[in-house]
A protein has these predicted regions:
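Short, small-residue-biased leader/transition segments that mark boundaries at the very start
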Residues: 1-13
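PP2C/PPM family metal-dependent serine/threonine protein phosphatase catalytic domain
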Residues: 93-117, 171-177, 206-238
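Short hydrophobic/glycine-rich mini-motifs in sensory/regulatory modules
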Residues: 37-41, 96-98, 124-129, 243-246, ...
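Catalytic core of PPM/PP2C metal-dependent serine/threonine phosphatase domains
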Residues: 15-39, 50, 58-87, 94, ...
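Active-site-proximal, acidic helix/loop segment immediately C-terminal to a metal-coordinating Asp/Glu
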Residues: 135-159, 222-223, 241, 245-297, ...
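Acidic loop->beta-strand submotif enriched in PP2C/PPM serine/threonine phosphatases
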Residues: 111-125, 183-186, 218-259, 293-298
Length: 313
């Protein structure tokens, strides 16, 4: 139910066939998918008619001209070249926004492995997913456990699950695995590059910080360790992101290193003082700031950052 499938409108279909014919490309079947966020995905069965090849990137440019000047690109898992044999190529309408990312981490003192795992991935519908999984404890066991949680989440998103449905399923899997499995917390930020809307989903995870024009916002959920209580709903928060907003996600080891009782406020005040910089530099600086208060890392420490900007045509 996350997308609707229908044929191209007759006139649009006719325009595409005529336009591609000018470039010596014959089109067969045309299918159009539309996601809940309004983003479109197209499947074109195509072949060249002059015995030569055309790249899917060039075909995407042709398509954009017919589709009201919108920007399209071939899907990463689709064919990169159209040849003289009919093949189906998948195209995605590009979102109005683009993102850049950064990550910085350090394991607990004395450990070779970090029990924190993170990922950045693009799921269908122009959704960018940042996930941070914090293994209970540290070292190799926690690393393996949190890696499994992150990989399962990625796989579910890639097969078309919504972020909320993916999290609920991951939580169920952990419950079935039992408490002896060193359950991990999960922090998921899903950014829709079509609309600029961020959905943050947390299961036992520490707050996320959004640096915007109005200051630094704290997005937090109540503490519920993932896989501990049955029937626990993931806490879902939503926020519209604007040009230049920056997202900062941290593992609990980062906040715990900060001075005072109100760790969130200490981080908020620090982030309000940082200058404009790239996401990777920001991630490094946040980690350096946290580490500066302790003689050695008492826990795994991870910082993820992302910045959002409007895509220029």
């Amino acid at each position: 139910d996350h997308r609707d499938l229908h044929s191209f409108p007759t006139r649009r279909s006719s325009d595409l066939k005529k336009y591609f014919k000018r470039y010596h490309v014959a089109l067969g079947n045309l299918l159009l998918l539309e996601y809940e966020n309004g983003q479109k995905e197209a499947f074109l069965t195509a072949r060249t008619t002059n015995g030569r090849c055309i790249t899917s990137k060039d075909a995407a440019l042709i398509m954009g001209e017919v589709m009201d000047g919108t920007r399209w690109s071939p899907a990463k898992d689709s064919r990169s070249i159209i040849t003289k044999q009919y093949e189906t190529v998948r195209f995605l309408e590009e979102g109005g926004y683009r993102m850049l990312y950064g990550a910085s981490r350090i394991p607990k003192k004395g450990e070779k492995y970090s029990g924190d795992n993170y990922t950045f991935c693009e799921s269908p519908g122009n959704q960018v997913v940042m996930s941070l999984s914090d293994g209970m404890g540290s070292g190799e066991t926690a690393a393996r456990e949190s890696k499994q949680v992150v990989e399962l989440t990625e796989q579910l998103l890639e097969t078309g699950f919504s972020p909320r449905a993916a999290l609920k399923l991951v939580n169920t899997v952990l419950l079935l695995a039992g408490p002896e499995q060193h359950p991990a917390t999960l922090d998921l930020s899903c950014i829709d590059l079509h609309t600029g809307v961020l959905e943050a989903m947390k299961l036992g995870a520490v707050p996320t910080f959004i640096i915007g024009e109005e200051g630094v916002e704290i997005m937090e959920a109540g503490e519920v360790p993932m896989g501990i209580l049955s029937g626990v709903e993931p806490v879902l928060m939503s926020r519209k992101l604007w040009e230049g907003d920056r997202i900062v996600m941290v593992s609990d080891g980062v906040l715990d290193a900060l001075p005072g009782d109100d760790k969130e406020q200490a981080m908020q005040q620090y982030l309000e003082s940082v200058e404009e910089m790239g996401p990777q530099e920001l991630a490094d600086q946040v980690l350096d700031f946290a580490v500066s208060f302790i003689p050695a890392p008492r826990d795994d420490m991870t910082v993820l950052t992302a910045g959002i900007w409007k895509r220029r045509s």
